């Protein structure tokens, strides 16, 4: 791991430390300022940090080797988002207010259409790698996996690609959508559907993935 990779691995620790400091400040001298600062630290600082990071270190939407002795932009992006994986309730809270979670994902760089319904336990690994149309329903415990990692001998292969979902799509509970997956307008995915890497799902049919990872 490079020096930059080691440094950025402490990003979530820094965010947590800022949150603790803000809470202690509130206990010492309470006012409306601290809750506002806490919300900014938790929900605005990470996506804005990600955008700045991406400006200098663009994430390649393709196959790469994590074992190489050079900085991985994906690794940095992963560390910036790590706090939401460790504490999923932070994201779930945003889904209480209609439209707020979609707006937050747009802040990360995803394209999200109107009237997308997110159930509280949806899991997204790469918040910048979604292209979703309008009126999409995401069922309970759906997973959107914008990357895949697989060992290949002495190498660690990383594949990243945007997930594309059309409009008027229903995604059944427990479904898992892999990187590069394309789901057509009007598609219906039954409960526990797995859409594999680069797989294309039509409104009535499902094709095998064109690329094997």
PLM segments and residue spans:
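Hydrophobic, membrane-inserted alpha-helices
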Residues: 17-21, 116-118, 171
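Generic structural signal for bulky hydrophobic/aromatic residues embedded
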Residues: 52, 119-121, 172
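Glycine-rich hexapeptide-repeat left-handed beta-helix
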Residues: 138-213
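Short linear elements at protein peripheries
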Residues: 97-129, 133-134
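Terminal amphipathic alpha-helical/low-complexity segments used for targeting or macromolecular assembly
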Residues: 1-108
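Glycine-centered flexibility motif
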Residues: 60-66, 109, 113, 139, ...
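A short, structure-level motif marking secondary-structure boundaries and short turns
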Residues: 85-87, 117-118, 150-151
């Amino acid at each position: 791991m490079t020096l930059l990779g080691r440094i950025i691995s402490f990003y979530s620790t820094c965010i947590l430390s800022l949150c603790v400091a803000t809470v202690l400040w509130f206990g010492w001298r309470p006012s409306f300022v601290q809750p506002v600062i806490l919300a900014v630290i938790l929900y605005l600082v990470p996506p804005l940090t990600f955008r700045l990071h991406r400006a200098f270190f663009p994430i390649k939407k393709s196959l790469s080797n994590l074992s190489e002795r050079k900085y991985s932009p994906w690794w940095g992006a992963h560390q910036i988002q790590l706090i939401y994986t460790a504490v999923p309730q932070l994201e779930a809270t945003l889904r209480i207010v209609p439209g707020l979670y979609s707006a937050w994902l747009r802040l990360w760089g995803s394209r999200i259409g109107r009237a997308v319904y997110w159930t509280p336990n949806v899991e997204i690994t790469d918040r910048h790698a979604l292209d979703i149309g309008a009126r999409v329903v995401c069922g309970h415990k759906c997973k959107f996996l914008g990357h895949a990692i697989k060992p290949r001998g002495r190498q660690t292969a990383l594949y990243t690609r945007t997930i594309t979902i059309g409009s008027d799509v229903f995604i059944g509970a427990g479904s898992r959508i892999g990187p590069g997956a394309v789901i057509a307008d009007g598609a219906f995915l039954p409960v526990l559907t797995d859409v594999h890497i680069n797989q294309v799902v039509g409104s009535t049919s499902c094709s095998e993935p064109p690329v094997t990872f």
